């Protein structure tokens, strides 16, 4: 985050932030926010492929031509016009960097995502910076570029948590909207219940957070909610 902020300040860089959760700390630095549905990263990569790749081979051109962009946009809640705007914002930039977070490694469609990103790296002028070393190796060594169709988006309804490692606390940080849906208040002790796990946390309402995705703070040595970092959960108040 600090490197991004520094680049924006020093070079007047245009910063386009793509994520299901808006980051209040970055709000004053980004040029454009593309907020998409949880789980739709494969579709987002396809939209990037369509917008940013140049001089592809015929097979990839056909793949792009056959993409149902309207459907992908609708399912991911990220409009084609947002990617057109992102491309327009990039045209006059001398250096263009696409930063790939470590959320993707445990995505159930990671293999096709890796192929999409490998092609974007090969056929666009985007410089890929991949924060996870394992994912970076997968993308850099990907030899099979036979793309699969974009899978229908799995529905993530109700209350969701996004796991973030934080060495200083282990709260459940929620928006007022999330608190209203879950029927909880600030400082309530709650159980967070997923398909396979049940953990206890203290609710902290953050007025700068919006939407129905809560931030689940987790200590680095805490072995909880592994896999894809977003989980569909139920929230249950701890009875005193």
Each PLM stretch: what is its role?
Residues 39, 43, 81, 111-115:
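Conserved active-site and cofactor/substrate-binding residues in soluble primary-metabolism enzymes
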Residues 1-78:
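Glycine-rich, acidic loop regions that bind phosphate or pyrophosphate groups
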Residues 1-28, 106-240:
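A cross-kingdom feature strongest in bacterial/archaeal respiratory oxidoreductases
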Residues 41, 105-106:
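Alpha-helix N-cap/loop-to-helix initiation residues
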Residues 82-97:
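Glycine-rich phosphate/diphosphate-binding loops that line cofactor/substrate pockets in enzymes
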Residues 55-56, 93, 97, 127:
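Short secondary-structure junctions and interdomain/linker hinges
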Residues 101-102:
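Extended, domain-scale alpha-helical bundle/helix-rich regions
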Residues 31, 96, 171:
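Conserved acidic residues
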